């Protein structure tokens, strides 16, 4: 048996590694580099370039140079994120015959699996050159949040490249394998993986050679490419302001800007300021134009702050699903080139409350983990057991449109689960099994993966036939569903292969809708409560001003009236925090009024003051309550 290699097929760069004895080794490519740009280009004379040679000529050949192809793999052409990507890349994204997103050069269409296969071939050749023997088998990594279609498309890419893909492994899990290989201590780790195109976070328990994934979460359209694009947007906006020329329609200029943006981003990880100089970026009637400006780290951080913050919510969800708090995480492992950014490290440290572990190379650790898994499958690595999970719940539609889960998200894979259902009507001779993926209680709110019919059920009263539905998820995360009539033993099987995969928007909708609906309701309730507080305070303060306004100075009275006006203005908006702040300002401003009221009540022998003071006491009466929908397990399930 030949060597099994481990490949990290990345959005921006790819890397290949192999086990040498008991140690994994990253293999240098023909150019002497340990990583290879995931870029494929076609020249004027039809030559295909892969890696660094393709990257070098990208500026002069933008329409035939394909990068960040991983963002299209397993997606349909109509996917909103495909449409978004069309506006971000200089090459043409076209509709494939099967409705998937493909790319086009010189009138010829290529599937993302094909383009990815060219990069995989380069990785295969790199390994063969080092090992001096043919390589036919590999372990390939994918983002943990990749869906079934994206995993299938990645396996297809391996096949096109001449590789038998023995296992598809999740990137954060691979990183954990590499991190934990030589470490004897047990513990709970978080892998924060912010790569070129995708973000994943996984919580794992490690001990005695067992790597058990407790939960995973992520965003399949968030990564370094987006950081680069923010810089490009800033540069084009500044240039338009200065020169009045829009560079966004100039593909050559955009490609130069993209390269400059990536270079500036990398420099700003170690420097606090960098200079971007692009002479002859364009020209108009008055002559050539040059772009030259300084970009500070602070400005760059402000441009991408929301992107960095977007990584925190998946971290929060992963912790919740794993049933652990941030303080219970023993180590945070950073993976992906974008984690070199100081701001990212700072945000991770603030969230987890500890300095992230920087002992692994973020560009190589995933490929090393893939090589370790290859070693496990080959028998070279002993005493290592990897237990991964499925990222979303799977189930079927039952009577009344209810989504009945058979396999919950974050269930360890491989797994198999069966459940017996029955008919909804008398003498029903067929049932339609509709397979869904998601977290909502009603099937229609989730993603339909596929459907099939089980026919030939013998006539019987409703509720009598016994139909066994079995879900089977293999170690690659790929789904099979079987329905069987227990009376006749007739069965029908479907391998879930969505034509274009799930969109990122769909996945976010599935996971978020169940939890975020509750979160949105909570936020709406909080807004109503702070508005009520603000309005009550205005009413009480105005009443007090009319009664005791002559007891305070004109300056104090003016401050109170200004604070009332500011709060009224805030109440017209939807910003709860802003309303709270203005409410607090009015409380502070009306303190003098409270003192005057108290003094007056003392003089009059009154028992105490009312109005603004009483509102002050009540400002913390808001009770926040999280709630969860509880599934009725005893509910009778019928198909």
From Swiss-Prot:
GO molecular function: ATP binding; ATP-dependent protein folding chaperone; unfolded protein binding
Stretches for region Disordered: 598-639
Induction: By stress conditions e.g. heat shock.
The keyword Glycosyltransferase appears for this protein: no
Phosphothreonine modification, residue list: 198
Keywords, in A-Z order: ATP-binding, Chaperone, Nucleotide-binding, Phosphoprotein, Stress response
Protein known as: Chaperone protein DnaK
Gene name of the encoded protein: dnaK
């Amino acid at each position: 048996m030949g060597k099994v290699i481990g490949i990290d097929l990345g959005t921006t760069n790819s890397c290949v590694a192999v086990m040498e004895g008991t140690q994994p080794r990253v293999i240098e490519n023909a150019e002497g580099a340990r990583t290879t740009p995931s870029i494929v280009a076609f020249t004027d004379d039809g030559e295909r370039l892969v890696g660094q040679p393709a990257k070098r000529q990208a500026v002069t050949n933008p329409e035939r140079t394909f990068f960040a192809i991983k963002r299209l793999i397993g997606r349909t052409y109509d996917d909103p994120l495909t449409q978004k990507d069309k506006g971000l890349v200089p090459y043409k994204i076209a509709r494939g015959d099967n409705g998937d997103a493909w790319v086009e050069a010189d009138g010829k269409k290529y599937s993302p699996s094909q383009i990815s296969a060219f990069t995989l071939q380069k990785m295969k050749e790199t390994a063969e050159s080092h090992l001096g023997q043919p390589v036919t088998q590999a372990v390939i990594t994918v983002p943990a949040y990749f869906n079934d279609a994206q995993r299938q498309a990645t396996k297809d890419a391996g096949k096109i490249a001449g590789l038998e893909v023995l296992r598809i492994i999740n990137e954060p899990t691979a990183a954990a394998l590499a991190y934990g290989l030589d470490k004897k201590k047990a513990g709970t780790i978080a892998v924060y993986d912010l790569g070129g195109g995708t973000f994943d976070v996984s919580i794992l328990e490690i001990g005695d050679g067992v790597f058990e994934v407790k939960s995973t979460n992520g965003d399949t359209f968030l990564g370094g490419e987006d950081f680069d694009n923010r810089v490009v947007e800033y540069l084009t906006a500044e240039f338009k302001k200065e020169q009045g020329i829009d560079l966004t329609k100039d593909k050559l200029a955009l490609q130069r800007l993209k390269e400059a943006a990536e270079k500036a981003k990398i420099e700003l990880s170690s420097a606090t300021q960098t200079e971007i100089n692009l002479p002859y970026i364009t020209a108009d009637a008055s002559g050539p134009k040059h772009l030259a400006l300084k970009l500070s780290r602070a400005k760059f951080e402000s441009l991408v702050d929301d992107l960095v913050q977007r990584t925190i919510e998946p971290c929060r969800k992963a912790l919740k699903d794993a049933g652990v708090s941030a303080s219970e995480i023993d180590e945070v492992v950073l993976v992906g080139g974008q984690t070199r950014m100081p701001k990212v490290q700072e945000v991770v440290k603030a969230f987890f409350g500890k300095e992230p572990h920087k002992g692994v190379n973020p560009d190589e650790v995933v490929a090393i983990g893939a090589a370790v898994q290859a070693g496990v499958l080959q028998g070279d690595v002993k005493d290592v057991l990897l237990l991964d999970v499925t990222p979303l719940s799977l189930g079927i539609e039952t009577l009344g449109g209810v989504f009945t889960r058979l396999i919950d998200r974050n269930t360890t894979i491989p797994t198999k689960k069966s459940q017996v259902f029955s008919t909804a009507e008398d003498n029903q001779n067929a049932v339609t099994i509709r397979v869904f993926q998601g977290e909502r209680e009603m099937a229609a709110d989730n993603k339909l993966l596929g459907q099939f019919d089980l026919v030939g059920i013998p006539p019987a009263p409703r509720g009598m036939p016994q139909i066994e539905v079995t879900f089977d998820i293999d170690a690659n995360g790929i789904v099979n569903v079987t329905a069987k009539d227990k009376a006749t033993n007739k069965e029908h099987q479907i391998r879930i292969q969505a034509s274009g995969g799930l969109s990122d928007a769909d996945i976010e909708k599935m996971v978020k809708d169940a939890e975020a609906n509750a979160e949105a309701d909570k936020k709406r309730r909080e807004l109503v409560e702070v508005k009520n507080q603000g309005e009550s305070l205005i009413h009480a303060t105005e009443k007090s001003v009319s009664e005791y306004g002559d007891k305070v100075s004109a300056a104090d009275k003016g401050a109170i009236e200004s604070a009332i006006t500011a709060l009224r203005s805030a109440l017209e908006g939807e910003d709860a925090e802003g309303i709270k702040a203005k409410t607090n300002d009015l409380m502070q401003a009306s303190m003098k009024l409270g003192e005057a009221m108290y003094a007056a009540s003392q003089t009059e022998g009154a028992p105490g003051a009312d109005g603004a003071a009483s509102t002050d006491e009540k400002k913390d009466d808001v009770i926040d309550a999280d709630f969860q929908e509880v599934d009725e397990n005893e509910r009778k399930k019928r198909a």
